């Protein structure tokens, strides 16, 4: 009796279950609508996992299809049973024995066990050798090794001789166990087992039960026999049955197509032609020598293919294929050299043409004639017509299409990749008439045998679609698997073919095509969607082929149709029966033989009465879970738990039968679900109900603990039940475009004015404060930089100086440097006297002088500014001071002010006339300290010059330097018509008064502290020494300005001093505010305390020979300073430091010397040895033991030695000259001379030197360097004269706070970047720890969602804005003429409004306002300081610029004045219009004599020149800057765009992200200054909770008064500080106190025998503890750190995900902190690169493998097992650490392989999770974690610091910024992602990987390899 499925169906009886006719309605069958979530059975687990379960449970024979799965099962089983084999052989431990058939398999197994476990493995493969061993020798082996891998012969020998008894074996593994059926040692070994009472567990492995055709009876017998011999149950892997045995089985149909009737006779005729030709060729006896090609081969192949097409598809197709083959043949004929071969090819060609001609007689090839196709084809078309969609479906299914889910893919490997970015290409023309790709309800595959059949059948179906509207919906394509095989090398042409195939697959996956015609290649291994129609056009010939093609029909309603010719049908039915029988046998062997399909037949019955549903809000029909839907809910919930691409978490259900015949089920959820206990259901009548009921109970529990939401769906990470964590803030309403928190969004803020300077203009008869601005030259300009050989003018040489008069006191701020032409000048602001009053007249005089300084000396007044001292927000007076009558007391210099008022030269040019009668008389003393004005030119803005030198040897009659004039007198007569009255007067060499008013940074260094190139130093020297380049003036023609040069030089510093003062006061104010908000530091500083000086932290390095400057003793005596002293460095010292690294920067020690107090003995001896040795490429001083040393060196580092700006210095001898902090005036508090020695740890333990005069060494700052560890201890113990103040107790140095407020765009000597990075990693750490401890039940997905919300730029920006940071930030370069508002001035609204929109002075500030030039990289806002061409001197040395550039800038500088700038926020750059620089109409400059006038040009606008070349400025579309001009109406930016217009003097425009950066930098600043607890409190005060709040009772408040000392809480974030040790004080309003974080209480679950299980699971881990040198107090942490989510045998702890979340942040912080504290002081860029090079998965995974983490890893995931296996092998071969730049590919010969070796993320994860585990286990001690991890990471940190690696993608983009373009992702045939990078002109490079990111870096790495290989040929531009 035939089974109904096999009835041959006639045409009429073909009943297909198509989606359209399905009872569930037309859409149910959309293949992509169905999620891969099973609703009526639990999601099946991977078959290998179930086989492992079986093997753990009982003796098992594993029948697998492939070899790879065998190893996995064997190794994991060994590991699971490993606790039985650790330790000495009997009595306690046993041994595991692996038996293999041949010697060469031994090594393979050995490496597998060694790779994945730490067990000791012995290998025995040589019978001769092993047979001769004695019993003793064997027992040694057994003692040493726990796993024995031997060939069966050796094993038999060992067992027979009793060297090892079977009872000592815990597990016996037989590889290739099917051999036991034959007469084989395996059989004898099993015989021995029979006699043994305690037989070991047996595992048999076989892959060859099924080979080719075999008879079901035989098969069954074979299996039974094997089971009997091995005393085991055979279990097959599902891959032999049907790939997913729970998928509903497809409906199988065999169709009898009926005979082919050849009415026209064409078929017969063609067949005859072909057969004759084939016979003819076969008969030609062409002698074939073995070496030659067979001449007939190609012809035979072509003809037989053609014949096959004719037979299978009919004449129409044969015609098509003949046409294709003719084209193909032409190529062969053209290239064929040999005559004979050629003849055969031509013969074939002729025949094919003949066939085509015959066909043309019968039908027109253009259209399809169904008379000429076989019945099989007709049948196929008929089946396809049934799948035609209904009309209405065409609309509704669009929705499904859009919601389709990636779960529809068979392969899981794509679960993490997005392919949204793939462009959908234009379809080929024939498809255009299809309604749309959405209507494809069909998703089908037709399997054919031959390639040509596939190609032609596809053509035929396309033709049929054109003619038959019923078939028009089909969009088909074919895939032949040509060259798709994985490993063979591929030619270019094959490569193209391969690409085409992948495109076909991509379209099929995307449902753009709905029918695929394929050869058997698609049967296995290719990732394609679930199909609802599979047609076997050619019948399957063996079981495997049958099962695998059937396995493709996996949609819920699917048909598997086999088309058979009438003559074949009988024999096929026999085959089919066999296949079915085999399938059945194998099914029974399936480890879970519940047959999904049959069990569900009665699913439709309403079971609600059996067990009531779980309903929410029953009254209003709320959501419910019924007994029928519960399993689906549980599956869906498990699928949403966090996991990696390798693991798909599924529930595990065990059903047991009770004695009374009822069943109960126990349900276990994956181990990372918060519901950890197993759930036991009530007993039910049948298995199915038992399983369902337990699921229903589970849903109820999940809902109760908040894991299912109110719709009973899994709670996503977004709908966090921890609402309070995401303080949901209302997003501010702004009209500003851009995403909040991003760089694209900029807003304007007013610039902050410090409270103490706000409206503090002195009033008559009210008490005032007078401050002195002390100026001391601490580092004179070295000769190398003094190109003009100018004399240096130390400001302290003259007594007259400036002071500040104010109505409010100014807090103490650190001294700070300004850089004048003479060198570095240290500025101090000291209180001179207070409480005095001034009269109205005095104040008026002072006010007039104040205005005179800013308007006339500094020329800062412009139309837009108005002097209104009473109305100005920031108002105080600047006035001259001098010593009073020979005493040394300074006071206000009223006489001087009055003299100035009277002077004629005060404003204009005095009109003195000399004549022959009253000739000019030269008085030398008048000119010694004078500023002079030429009286004959530039009357509106006369030039002012310092007299540099009086040339007594020159007179007006001396020779004029240029040939046009004879003498100076003649020049003036000719050019200006001036006659001189005194021809004997000397001439004056003059210098311009400085126009550079930004003196914040030295001009020979850029803002990174790096010397600007001095290439032209020699040229310059020559230039300045020749007279031609000097300005020579005649005294008679000049007027003397009433302000002496010495005071003028000080006045030039005023803008910089006041600006810096202003910024530091803002920072000090912020420090005080934080002290009251967060309780960190004190509100007001003690009167006797001053912070160490502001320091840029770089040594001023210059590229030149070492120079020696001597101590100028006369100065030293007068002024109490020894002025310039440096270490004298021998010329060759630099070369001795042989191992110099480019990063090295502090190669010589700097020494400061300060005059000792009077009681100490006279002169200070400086004896510093010059013997510098190089240690690690850094030179240090060997013998610094002299007592004077400490004093000498201590002032140099200034506490926050945060040397931010180290840059790579060219490797040339470099010298440092000292920074000296010299204090002025006796009445100031004694400064603390503290210093953190950079090189502390190298100073031979000599750190504790004391100062020579016995004054105790004072230290006020913690050592920030790691090198300063020793110092740190000393600091804690010492008592300093300033009562032990330190920034730990007082708060950070305002200088450091200022640094945290300064963006890199400000081009200052420091910026926030380094601090920001430190703050960033600490913030991540603090929040992570807080979340980890506060939410012990939240899984990693939720924790990381909460973290990302908290640390997002958007959130930080909000908090920073709330705290008022934007106003305090320093965002643009200080340029006094453009954006500085002098004290007492206001922006004149009337004048500036008129000009708000059109300004011609939009110089650089527009570009520098903040953010990058045009192009915002996401990482950092960096702006390279592009100085003009000769960078070294942009101040006032004549630079060679084009005439028109100079005119342009001059005209800009003479422009209208108010600097308002406009930024267009349009996304498009209007580059053409934005850069028309318009000249003002009054271009009165004409052509000017180069030698003089050009010198006057104001280089303070040097930056305008940087932007002369528009191409450099705005590259992309961030914002466009318009340069506006009053005289031109509509130039510049299109007025349509939205723009921000703001006033540069009082407002600043800042990107949101910069504010977020600033918050992080401030955090870094508090962290380095006040420690970790303080940083946490600072975060809490911002509103970021990182500590638990505790409420204190009033009694406690009394116990812990507000101002408690802070140091008690300095324990690193440890949970050990008592919860009551709360913050010292919070702001009065909020009574919040913060406690300390508590370690989450339990890490083990309540479990009856938890301890036992724990010891069981971590057996062997003691070896690992030894390896990392840390012993766990609580071993559960250790187990948790190694438990992967797939490892369900661990029922007592969670998996590692939470610890990984914690460890990731801890390692990031520790590594960042270490890099930050590196004595090499890496620059921000290097720091970022190093951090990303060290904190990444590749490095962590490599280290994990190096330290054997993988051997202890606990996971049950076959794919992961293989990836780890590959990676470990790869690491062993490479045997070196992998950096980002490392070659992650297998070896040289894999050049063709596009894929990098895959780095298993799980390895990096356990590296992190172990850090988290140690942190928790050690009571939250970061130190302990670092002690364990630093030794592992140290070699890498050293290696990378010396040579910073960059990610390949970045390196490529830096190398080829214009030409490298990455393609979007393409999906490869096996589900991976491919990315192509094209480097224009140099080739295309491809990379493949599991995700877009991995593929992208693989591609970049390939491109780099190729570019580097070809570099020599590329000329270096």
UniProtKB/Swiss-Prot annotation:
Cofactors required: Mg(2+); Mn(2+)
Site entry (Important for activity), positions: 1801
Residue numbers binding Mg(2+) 2: 1700, 1805, 1808
Record note on cofactor: Binds 2 magnesium or manganese ions per subunit.
The protein's enzyme class: hydrolase
Region annotation (Required for interaction with PRKRA and TARBP2) ranges: 256-595
Binding site for ATP: 64-71
Biased composition (Acidic residues): 414-425
Domain RNase III: 1276-1403, 1661-1819
Pfam families: Dicer_dimer, Dicer_dsRBD, Dicer_PBD, Dicer_platform, Helicase_C, PAZ, ResIII, Ribonuclease_3
Residues bound to Mg(2+) 1: 1316, 1395, 1398
Chain residue ranges for the region called Disordered: 409-433
Keywords: ATP-binding, Cytoplasm, Endonuclease, Helicase, Hydrolase, Magnesium, Manganese, Metal-binding, Nuclease, Nucleotide-binding, Phosphoprotein, Repeat, RNA-binding, RNA-mediated gene silencing
Domain PAZ: 895-1042
Biological process, per Gene Ontology: apoptotic DNA fragmentation; global gene silencing by mRNA cleavage; negative regulation of tumor necrosis factor production; negative regulation of tumor necrosis factor-mediated signaling pathway; pre-miRNA processing; RISC complex assembly; siRNA processing
Gene Ontology molecular functions: ATP binding; deoxyribonuclease I activity; DNA binding; double-stranded RNA binding; helicase activity; metal ion binding; pre-miRNA binding; protein domain specific binding
Compartment(s) where it occurs, according to its Swiss-Prot or TrEMBL record: Cytoplasm
Similarity-based family: Belongs to the helicase family. Dicer subfamily.
Protein task: Double-stranded RNA (dsRNA) endoribonuclease playing a central role in short dsRNA-mediated post-transcriptional gene silencing. Cleaves naturally occurring long dsRNAs and short hairpin pre-microRNAs (miRNA) into fragments of twenty-one to twenty-three nucleotides with 3' overhang of two nucleotides, producing respectively short interfering RNAs (siRNA) and mature microRNAs. SiRNAs and miRNAs serve as guide to direct the RNA-induced silencing complex (RISC) to complementary RNAs to degrade them or prevent their translation.
Description of how the protein assembles with itself and partners: Component of the RISC loading complex (RLC), or micro-RNA (miRNA) loading complex (miRLC), which is composed of DICER1, AGO2 and TARBP2; DICER1 and TARBP2 are required to process precursor miRNAs (pre-miRNAs) to mature miRNAs and then load them onto AGO2. Note that the trimeric RLC/miRLC is also referred to as RISC. Interacts with DHX9, AGO1, PIWIL1 and PRKRA. Interacts with AGO2, TARBP2, EIF6, MOV10 and RPL7A (60S ribosome subunit); they form a large RNA-induced silencing complex (RISC). Interacts with BCDIN3D.
Protein name: Endoribonuclease Dicer
Gene: DICER1
């Amino acid at each position: 009796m035939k089974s109904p499925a096999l009835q041959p169906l006639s045409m009429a009886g073909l009943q297909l279950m198509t989606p359209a006719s399905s009872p569930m309605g037309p859409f149910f069958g959309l293949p992509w609508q169905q999620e891969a979530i099973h609703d009526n059975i639990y999601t099946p687990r991977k078959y290998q996992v179930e086989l492992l379960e079986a093997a753990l449970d009982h003796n098992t024979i594993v029948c697998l299809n492939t070899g790879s799965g065998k190893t996995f099962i064997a190794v994991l089983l060994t590991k699971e049973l490993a606790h039985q084999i650790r330790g000495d052989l009997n009595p306690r431990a046993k041994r595991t024995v692996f038996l293999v058939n041949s010697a060469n398999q031994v090594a393979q197994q050995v490496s597998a066990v060694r790779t994945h476990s730490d067990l000791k493995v012995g290998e025995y493969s040589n019978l001769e050798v092993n047979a001769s061993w004695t019993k003793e020798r064997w027992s040694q082996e057994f003692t040493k090794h726990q796993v024995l891998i031997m060939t069966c012969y050796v094993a038999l020998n060992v067992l027979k001789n009793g060297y090892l008894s079977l009872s000592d074996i815990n597990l016996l593994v037989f590889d290739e166990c099917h051999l036991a059926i034959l007469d084989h040692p395996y059989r004898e070994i099993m015989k021995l087992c029979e006699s043994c009472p305690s037989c070991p567990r047996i595992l048999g492995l076989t892959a060859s039960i099924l080979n080719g055709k075999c008879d079901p009876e035989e098969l069954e017998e074979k299996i039974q026999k094997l089971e009997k011999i091995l005393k085991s149950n055979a279990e097959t892997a599902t891959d032999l049955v049907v790939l997913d045995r729970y998928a509903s089985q497809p409906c199988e149909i065999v169709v009898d197509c009926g005979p082919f009737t050849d009415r026209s006779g064409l078929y017969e005729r063609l067949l005859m032609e072909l057969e004759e030709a084939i016979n003819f060729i076969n008969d030609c006896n062409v002698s074939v020598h073995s070496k030659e090609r067979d001449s007939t081969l190609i012809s035979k192949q072509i003809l037989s293919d053609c014949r096959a097409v004719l037979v299978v598809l009919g004449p129409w197709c044969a015609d098509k294929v003949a046409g294709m083959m003719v084209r193909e043949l032409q190529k062969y004929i053209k290239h064929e050299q040999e005559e004979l071969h050629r003849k055969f090819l031509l013969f074939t060609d002729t025949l094919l043409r003949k066939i085509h001609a015959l066909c043309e007689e019968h039908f027109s090839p253009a259209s399809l004639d169904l008379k000429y196709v076989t019945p099989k084809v007709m049948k196929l078309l008929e089946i396809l017509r049934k799948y035609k969609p209904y009309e209405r479906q065409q609309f509704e299914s669009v929705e499904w299409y859009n919601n389709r889910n990636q779960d529809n893919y068979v392969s899981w490997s794509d679960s993490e990749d997005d392919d949204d970015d793939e462009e959908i290409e234009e379809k080929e023309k024939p498809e255009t008439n299809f309604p749309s790709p959405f209507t494809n309800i069909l998703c089908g595959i037709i399997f054919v045998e031959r390639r040509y059949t596939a190609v032609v059948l596809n053509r035929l179906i396309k033709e049929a679609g054109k003619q038959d509207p019923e078939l028009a919906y089909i969009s088909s394509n074919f895939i032949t698997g040509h060259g798709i095989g994985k490993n063979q090398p591929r030619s270019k042409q094959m490569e193209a073919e391969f690409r085409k195939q992948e495109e076909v697959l991509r379209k099929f996956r995307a449902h753009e095509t709905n029918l695929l015609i394929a050869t058997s290649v698609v049967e296995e291994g290719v990732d394609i969607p679930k199909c609802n129609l599979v047609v076997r056009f050619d019948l399957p010939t063996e079981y495997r082929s049958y099962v695998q093609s059937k396995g493709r029909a996996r949609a819920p309603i699917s048909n598997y149709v086999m088309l058979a010719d009438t003559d074949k049908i009988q024999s096929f039915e026999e085959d089919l029966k066999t296949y079915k029988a085999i399938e059945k046998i194998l099914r029974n062997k399936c480890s879970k033989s519940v047959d999904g399909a049959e069990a569900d037949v009665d699913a439709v019955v309403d079971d609600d009465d059996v067990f009531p549903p779980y309903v929410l809000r029953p009254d209003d029909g709320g959501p419910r879970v019924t007994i029928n839907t519960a399993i689906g809910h549980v599956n869906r919930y498990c699928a949403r738990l966090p996991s990696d691409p390798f693991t798909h978490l599924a529930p595990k259900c065990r059903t047991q039968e009770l004695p009374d015949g009822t069943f109960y089920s126990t349900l276990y959820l994956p181990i990372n679900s918060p519901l950890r206990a197993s759930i036991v259901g009530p007993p039910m009548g049948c298995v199915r109900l038992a399983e369902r009921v337990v699921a229903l109970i589970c849903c109820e529990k999940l809902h109760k603990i908040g894991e299912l939401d109110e719709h009973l769906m899994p709670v996503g990470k977004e709908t966090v039940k921890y609402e309070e964590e995401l303080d949901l803030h209302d997003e501010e309403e702004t009209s500003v475009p851009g995403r909040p928190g991003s760089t694209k969004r900029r807003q304007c803020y007013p610039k902050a004015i410090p409270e103490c300077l706000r409206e503090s203009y002195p009033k008559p008869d009210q008490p005032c404060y007078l401050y002195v601005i002390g100026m001391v030259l601490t580092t004179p300009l070295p000769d190398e930089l003094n190109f003009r050989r100018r004399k240096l003018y130390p400001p302290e040489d003259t007594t007259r100086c400036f002071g500040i008069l104010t109505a409010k006191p100014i807090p103490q701020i650190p001294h700070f440097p300004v850089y004048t032409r003479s060198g570095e000048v240290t500025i101090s602001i000291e209180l001179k006297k207070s409480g005095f009053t001034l009269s109205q007249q005095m104040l008026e005089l002072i006010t007039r002088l104040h205005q005179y300084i800013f308007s006339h000396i500094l020329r800062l007044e412009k139309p837009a500014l108005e002097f209104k001292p009473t109305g100005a927000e920031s108002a105080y007076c600047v006035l001259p001071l001098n010593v009073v009558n020979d005493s040394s007391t300074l006071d206000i210099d009223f006489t001087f002010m009055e003299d100035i008022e009277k002077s004629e030269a005060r404003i204009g040019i005095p009109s003195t006339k000399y004549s022959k009668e009253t000739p000019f008389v030269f008085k030398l003393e008048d000119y010694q300290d004078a500023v002079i004005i030429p009286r004959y030119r530039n009357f509106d803005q006369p030039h002012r010059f310092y007299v540099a030198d009086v040339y007594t040897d020159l007179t007006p009659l001396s020779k004029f330097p240029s040939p046009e004039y004879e003498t100076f007198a003649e020049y003036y007569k000719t050019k200006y018509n001036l006659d001189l009255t005194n021809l004997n007067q000397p001439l004056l060499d003059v210098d311009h008064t400085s126009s550079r008013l930004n003196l914040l940074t030295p001009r020979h260094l850029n803002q990174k502290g790096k010397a600007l190139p001095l290439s032209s130093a020699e040229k310059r020297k020559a230039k300045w020494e020749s007279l031609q380049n000097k300005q020579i003036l005649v005294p008679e023609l000049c007027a003397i300005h009433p302000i002496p040069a010495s005071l003028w030089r000080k006045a030039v510093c005023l803008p910089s001093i006041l600006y810096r003062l202003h910024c530091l006061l803002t920072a000090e104010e912020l420090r005080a505010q934080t002290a009251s908000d967060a309780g960190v530091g004190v509100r007001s500083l003690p009167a006797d305390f001053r912070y160490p000086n502001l320091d840029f932290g770089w040594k001023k390095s210059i590229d030149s020979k070492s120079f020696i400057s001597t101590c100028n003793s006369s100065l030293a005596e007068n002024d109490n300073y020894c002025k310039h002293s440096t270490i004298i460095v021998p010329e060759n010292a630099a070369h001795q430091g042989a191992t110099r690294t480019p990063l090295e920067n502090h190669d010589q020690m700097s020494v400061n010397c300060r005059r000792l107090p009077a009681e100490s003995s006279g002169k200070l001896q400086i004896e510093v040895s010059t013997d510098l040795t190089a240690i690690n490429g850094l030179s240090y001083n060997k013998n610094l033991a002299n007592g004077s040393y400490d004093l000498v060196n201590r002032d140099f580092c200034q506490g926050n030695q945060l040397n931010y700006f180290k840059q790579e210095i060219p490797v040339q001898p470099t010298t440092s000259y000292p920074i000296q902090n010299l204090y002025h005036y006796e009445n100031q508090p004694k400064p603390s001379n503290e210093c953190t020695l950079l090189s502390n740890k190298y100073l031979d333990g000599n750190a504790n030197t004391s100062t020579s005069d016995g004054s105790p060494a004072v230290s006020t700052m913690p050592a920030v360097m790691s090198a300063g560890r020793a110092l740190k201890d000393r600091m804690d113990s010492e008592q300093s004269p300033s009562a032990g103040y330190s920034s730990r107790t007082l708060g950070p140095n305002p200088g450091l706070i200022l640094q945290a407020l300064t963006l890199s765009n400000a081009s200052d000597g420091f910026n926030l970047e380094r601090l920001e990075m430190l703050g960033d990693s600490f913030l991540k750490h603090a929040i992570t720890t807080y979340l980890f401890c506060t939410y012990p039940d939240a899984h990693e997905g939720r924790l990381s969602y909460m973290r990302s919300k908290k640390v997002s730029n958007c959130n930080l920006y909000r908090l920073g804005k709330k705290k008022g940071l934007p106003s305090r930030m320093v965002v643009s370069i200080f340029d006094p003429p453009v954006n500085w508002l002098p004290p007492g001035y206001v922006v004149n609204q009337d004048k500036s409004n008129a000009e708000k929109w059109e300004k011609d002075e939009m110089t650089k500030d527009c570009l520098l306002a903040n953010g990058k030039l045009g192009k915002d990289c996401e990482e950092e806002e960096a702006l390279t300081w592009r100085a003009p061409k000769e960078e070294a001197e942009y101040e006032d040395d004549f630079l060679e610029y084009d005439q028109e550039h100079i005119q342009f800038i001059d005209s800009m500088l003479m422009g209208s004045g108010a600097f308002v700038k406009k930024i267009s926020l349009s996304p498009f750059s209007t580059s053409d219009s934005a850069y028309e620089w318009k000249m003002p109409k009054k271009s009165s400059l004409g052509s000017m004599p180069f030698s003089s006038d050009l010198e006057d040009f104001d280089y303070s606008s040097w930056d305008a020149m940087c932007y002369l070349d528009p191409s450099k400025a705005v590259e992309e579309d961030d914002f466009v800057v318009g340069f506006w001009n009053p005289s031109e109406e509509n130039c510049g930016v299109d007025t349509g765009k939205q723009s921000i217009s703001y006033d540069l003097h009082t407002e600043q425009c800042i990107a949101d992200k910069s504010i977020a950066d600033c918050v992080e930098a401030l955090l870094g600043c508090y962290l380095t200054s006040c420690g970790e607890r303080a940083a946490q409190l600072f975060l809490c005060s911002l509103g970021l909770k990182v500590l638990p709040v505790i409420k204190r009772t009033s009694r406690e408040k009394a116990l812990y008064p507000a101002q408690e000392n802070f140091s008690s809480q300095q324990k690193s974030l440890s949970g050990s500080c008592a919860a009551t040790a709360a913050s010292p004080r919070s702001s009065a309003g909020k009574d919040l106190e913060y406690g300390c974080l508590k370690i989450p209480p339990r890490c083990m679950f309540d479990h009856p025998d938890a301890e036992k299980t724990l010891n069981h699971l971590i057996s062997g881990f003691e070896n690992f503890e030894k390896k990392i040198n840390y012993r766990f107090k609580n071993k559960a942490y250790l187990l948790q750190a190694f438990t992967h989510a797939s490892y369900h045998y661990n029922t007592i702890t969670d998996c590692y995900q939470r610890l990984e979340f914690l460890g990731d942040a801890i390692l990031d912080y520790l590594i960042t902190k270490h890099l930050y504290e590196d004595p090499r002081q890496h620059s921000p860029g290097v720091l970022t690169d190093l951090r990303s090079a060290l904190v990444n998965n590749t490095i962590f995974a490599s280290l994990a493998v190096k330290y054997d983490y993988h051997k202890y890893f606990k996971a049950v995931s076959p794919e992961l097992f293989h990836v780890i296996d590959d990676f470990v092998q790869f690491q062993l071969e490479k045997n070196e650490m992998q950096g980002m730049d490392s070659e992650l590919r297998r070896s040289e010969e894999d050049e063709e392989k596009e894929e990098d070796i895959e780095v298993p993320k799980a390895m990096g994860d356990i590296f992190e999770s172990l850090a988290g585990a140690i942190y928790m286990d050690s009571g939250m001690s970061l130190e302990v974690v670092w002690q364990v991890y630093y030794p592992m990471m140290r070699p890498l940190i050293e290696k990378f610091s010396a040579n910073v690696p960059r990610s390949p993608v970045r390196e490529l983009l830096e190398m080829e910024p214009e030409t490298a373009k990455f393609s979007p992702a393409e999906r490869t045939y096996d589900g991976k992602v491919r990315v192509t990078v094209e480097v224009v002109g140099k080739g295309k490079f491809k990379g493949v990987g599991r995700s877009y990111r991995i593929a992208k870096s693989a591609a970049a790495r390939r491109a780099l390899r190729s570019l580097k290989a070809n570099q020599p040929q590329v000329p270096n531009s």
